């Protein structure tokens, strides 16, 4: 080899290694008392803080995270939105990729920082997301995004400024919060025989308050038409904004169980006790980045469907679930639990304090949440600005509604991928019909007609290591198998199971790959193939510009109308991946299924350190 060639090789290796660096992180998980909304309870702290620390990496970094479990209960950590290509043992899902991390033990997760974008991490052991183990992840991209920013502004200075703003964004981890721990909360439902989902606060970056504006105010904040369309005439919410727990429309049925609403403790459904604490403050600097600021929102909610807006400020939505989308301008946007959004805001208003309104906009509860966006130097100013959302998440005018993002169906969700990325047209290679709903009790949820996914499913014998463990058993109804290199359609049907005709939304998340939502419609799925459905109902499908995400919302069924959705993906990441509802109560109640992608190319060379012992 010539001296010149040797020099080129050294330079190439240097730059490759300089970019793909190894990053080591340590997470120490502890359990102690805290009061993020001013009311004390026990919760999870990570490295002594709540929520968990934000992790910032560069695309293709080699990541090594050592998790020490210093609690008296099991834990795992799931890296939500990361594809875990060739590292399925680091997905963090008990029973699929690992055994739970027991008290006093540690686990080392190793994976590539991929794909770039806005993601998050959280506990995946039982319902412990309710207890506070969650934090933001930002993977800074290698590639040039000029084509993305030029859709917002053609000005070269703006384009450069937006790139800089996106490189160093503000992070807003939005969560819902209860006065009860996850174990206590679940026990309330099983003891009473009623699904209970009333909360106390919306937190932003671990800060919030308990608001008690009064029952009449909350009743007036109900979404227009909600009671008339979905509940008996005269239905009223409590002084916490919650619907009566024993409503048939809420609980479904009839079920062969005893309902004991008297076993619901005080202050769960009603008996609001206010507490003043503090809300998060986001300080922004209009003198930086030509007045542009990027904000990364993480919906770390367990039940709530979050809406957000900033008084007097429009924003450009440019990324969903770590995927860039062709930017669109809105004044408010709805996020389901599990999703991540990135927005770009121009700081072009009078310097001052502006309220960020972040309420629960779902039909589960009228619950407000707030933060403040403060122009640098205006910390002592009075609040200013025009509100786009009310306390309960209702648009303040018809114009606001027209300029808001609603993700429930094809005709309102036009956030197509950037750069263009579409699925194969026509038929997929495999189709799987999954019927979602409740079976046997208000808190029992299925993804496959009748099968309930246990919280300890395969915990001792994870399917990564024992992929055939469920064959010839009833538990095989909890497993789907696909072939590597195939296109797969997942057809989700809601509101057809007996007793569950009035179905609330489900926030469906697939590990290991993102999916395109190519179809959505009303009625019962009775087609022999997706291709047949496309031919009969072309208006209900989009294979040219469908959205690409890892978390999708199903429809809220009012009056027992059935709905279906079709999600398509390509199998190129063999491993055991959980597909589940991201509402913690629903997953705890059984709404999950294991998808063994690429069973014909199953990982054979699992590193020694991950082998079961």
Curated annotation (Swiss-Prot):
Note the InterPro entries from the entry.
Cu-oxidase-like_N, Cu-oxidase_2nd, Cu-oxidase_C, Cu-oxidase_fam, Cu_oxidase_CS, Cu_oxidase_Cu_BS, Cupredoxin
Annotated residues that bind Cu cation 2 are located at 80, 122, 582
Q: Which domain of life is it from?
A: Eukaryota
Q: Where is the Plastocyanin-like domain?
A: 29-142, 171-359, 468-598
The residues the record assigns to binding Cu cation 1 are: 78, 509
Keyword Metal-binding set for record: yes
* Carbohydrate attachment residues: 74, 256, 279, 444, 468, 484, 526
Q: What is the documented disruption phenotype for this protein?
A: Reduces significantly the conidial yields.
Query: EC no.?
Result: 1.10.3.-
Question: Any signal peptide, and if so, which residues?
Answer: 1-20
Query: Could you tell me the keywords of this UniProt record?
Result: Copper, Glycoprotein, Metal-binding, Oxidoreductase, Repeat, Signal
The protein's location, in the record's own words, is: Cell surface
Cofactor info, note text = Binds 4 Cu cations per monomer.
**Cofactors (names):** Cu cation
Q: In the record, what terms sit under GO molecular function?
A: copper ion binding; oxidoreductase activity
Pathway given in the UniProt record = Pigment biosynthesis
Question: Transferase: is it a keyword of this entry?
Answer: no
The terms describing its cellular component in GO are: cell surface
What does the record note about the induction of this protein? Highly expressed during conidiation. A conserved conidiation regulatory pathway containing BrlA, AbaA and WetA regulates expression. During conidiation BlrA up-regulates AbaA, which in turn controls WetA. Moreover, the Hog1 MAPK regulates fungal conidiation by controlling the conidiation regulatory pathway, and that all three pigmentation genes Pks1, EthD and Mlac1 exercise feedback regulation of conidiation.
Residues involved in Cu cation 3 binding? 124, 511, 580
| One Pfam family linked to the record | Cu-oxidase_3
Positions that bind Cu cation 4: 506, 509, 581, 586
Q: Which family does it belong to?
A: Belongs to the multicopper oxidase family.
Functional note? Laccase; part of the Pks1 gene cluster that mediates the biosynthesis of an anthraquinone derivative pigment that contributes to conidial pigmentation that provides protection from UV radiation, heat and cold stress. The polyketide synthase Pks1 produces 1-acetyl-2,4,6,8-tetrahydroxy-9,10-anthraquinone though condensation of acetyl-CoA with malonyl-CoA. The dehydratase EthD and the laccase Mlac1 further convert the anthraquinone derivative into the final conidial pigment.
Question: What protein name applies here?
Answer: Laccase 1
Upper classification of the source organism reads: Eukaryota, Fungi, Dikarya, Ascomycota, Pezizomycotina
């Amino acid at each position: 080899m010539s001296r010149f060639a040797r020099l080129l090789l050294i330079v190439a290796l240097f730059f490759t290694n300089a970019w793909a660096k190894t990053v080591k992180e340590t997470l120490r998980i502890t359990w102690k008392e805290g009061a993020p909304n001013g009311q004390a309870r026990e919760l999870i702290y990570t490295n002594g803080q709540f929520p968990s620390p934000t992790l910032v990496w560069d695309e293709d970094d080699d990541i090594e995270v050592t998790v020490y479990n210093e609690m008296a209960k099991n834990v795992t950590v799931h890296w939500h939105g990361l594809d875990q290509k060739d590292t399925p043992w680091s997905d963090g899902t008990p029973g699929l990729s690992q055994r739970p991390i027991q008290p006093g033990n540690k686990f080392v997760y190793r994976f590539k920082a991929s794909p770039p974008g806005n993601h998050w991490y959280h506990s995946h052991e039982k319902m412990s997301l309710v207890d506070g183990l969650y934090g933001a992840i930002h993977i800074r991209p290698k590639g040039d995004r000029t084509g993305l920013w030029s859709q917002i502004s053609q000005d070269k200075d703006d384009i450069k400024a937006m790139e800089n703003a996106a490189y160093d964004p503000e992070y807003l981890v939005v969560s819902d919060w209860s006065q009860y721990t996850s174990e206590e909360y679940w026990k309330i439902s099983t003891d009473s025989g009623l699904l209970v989902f009333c909360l106390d606060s919306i937190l932003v970056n671990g800060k919030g308050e308990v608001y008690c504006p009064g029952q009449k105010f909350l009743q007036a904040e109900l979404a227009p038409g909600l009671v008339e369309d979905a509940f008996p005439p005269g239905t009223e919410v409590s002084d916490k904004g919650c619907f009566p727990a024993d409503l048939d429309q809420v609980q479904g049925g009839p079920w062969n169980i005893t309902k004991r609403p008297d076993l619901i403790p005080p202050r769960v459904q009603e008996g609001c006790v206010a507490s003043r604490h503090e809300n998060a403050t986001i300080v922004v600097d209009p003198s930086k980045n030509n007045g542009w600021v990027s904000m990364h929102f993480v919906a770390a909610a367990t039940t709530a469907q979050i809406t957000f807006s900033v008084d007097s400020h429009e924003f450009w939505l440019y990324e969903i679930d770590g995927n860039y989308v062709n930017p669109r301008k809105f004044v408010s946007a709805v996020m389901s639990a599990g999703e991540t959004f990135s927005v770009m805001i121009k700081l072009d208003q009078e310097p001052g304090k502006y309220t960020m309104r972040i309420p629960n906009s779902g039909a589960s509860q009228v619950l407000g949440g707030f933060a403040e966006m403060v122009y640098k130097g205006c910390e002592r100013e009075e609040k200013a600005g025009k509100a786009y959302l009310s306390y309960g998440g209702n648009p303040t005018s018809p114009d606001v509604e027209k300029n808001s993002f609603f993700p429930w169906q094809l005709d309102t969700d036009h956030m197509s991928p950037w750069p263009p990325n579409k699925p194969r047209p026509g038929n997929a290679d495999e189709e799987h019909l999954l019927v979602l709903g409740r079976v046997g009790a208000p808190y029992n949820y299925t993804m496959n007609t009748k099968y309930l996914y246990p919280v300890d499913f395969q915990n001792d014998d994870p399917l990564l290591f024992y992929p055939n463990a469920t064959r010839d058993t009833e538990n095989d109804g909890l497993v789907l198998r696909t072939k590597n290199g195939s296109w797969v359609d997942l057809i989700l049907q809601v509101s057809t199971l007996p007793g569950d005709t009035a179905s609330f939304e489900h926030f469906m998340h697939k590990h290991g790959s993102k999916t395109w939502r190519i179809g959505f419609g009303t009625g019962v799925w009775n087609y022999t193939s997706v291709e047949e459905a496309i031919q009969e109902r072309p208006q209900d499908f989009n294979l040219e510009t469908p959205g690409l995400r890892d978390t999708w919302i199903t429809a809220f069924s009012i009056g027992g109308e059935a709905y279906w959705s079709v999600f398509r993906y390509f199998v190129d990441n063999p491993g055991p991946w959980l597909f589940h509802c991201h509402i913690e109560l629903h997953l705890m109640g059984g709404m999950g299924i294991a998808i063994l992608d690429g069973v014909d190319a199953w990982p054979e060379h699992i590193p020694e350190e991950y082998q079961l012992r």
